């Protein structure tokens, strides 16, 4: 969405956020170049579960957006008469579920180039290119009329591709390099990005 930068240049919001792009002519060269990259960061408080992140004294993660930005009620009928159950038979628990990755089988992949009309063209799987277009154009700093998104077969994304993933990274690399690029996430990157 609009709340996340394409590359986190000021703040890393979560494990797996992209902070740099390494582009090379072969995968071997790319891996060697990536190994040479050195990043200095100031470690911020890390919230390893949702309850810590929404605590009243928690630091704001996304500037201008509350950490608890969406709440829903659990509706399950009339209130239960707890007085009818002895205290010795009552228990109070607090629980939450961790983030569940979508675990689609095919890798997140795509490619991009500048076409004969001078448009940055990105091919990727998506289930909402009409939703992604303004986010990606804004993220890489090009007008929407200079960006073309082509939807490849999406397969079973299970919601993973409802938000843009690699498209902005591909578009940014094409814009900077002015040559064709491709990007294939491995399964670790699929889960953490």
What residues fall within each predicted segment?
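Structural alpha/beta core scaffold segments of enzyme domains
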Residues: 1-193
């Amino acid at each position: 969405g609009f709340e996340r930068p394409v590359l986190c240049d000021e703040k890393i919001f979560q494990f797996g956020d992209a902070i740099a792009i390494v582009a090379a002519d072969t995968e071997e060269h790319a891996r060697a170049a990536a190994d040479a990259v050195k990043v200095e960061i100031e470690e911020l408080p890390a919230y390893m579960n949702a309850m810590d992140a929404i605590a009243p004294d928690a630091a704001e993660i996304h500037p201008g957006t509350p950490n608890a930005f969406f709440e829903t009620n659990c509706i399950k009928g009339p209130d239960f008469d707890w007085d009818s159950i002895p205290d010795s038979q009552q228990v109070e628990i607090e629980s939450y579920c961790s983030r569940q990755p979508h675990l689609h089988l095919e890798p997140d992949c795509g490619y991009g180039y500048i076409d004969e009309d001078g448009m940055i063209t990105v091919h990727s799987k998506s289930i909402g290119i009409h939703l992604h277009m303004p986010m990606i154009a804004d993220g890489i700093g090009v007008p929407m009329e200079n960006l073309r998104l082509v939807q490849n077969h999406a397969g079973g994304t299970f919601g993973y591709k409802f938000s843009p993933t690699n498209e902005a990274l591909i578009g940014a690399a094409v814009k900077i390099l002015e040559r064709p690029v491709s990007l294939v996430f491995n399964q670790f990157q699929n889960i953490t990005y």
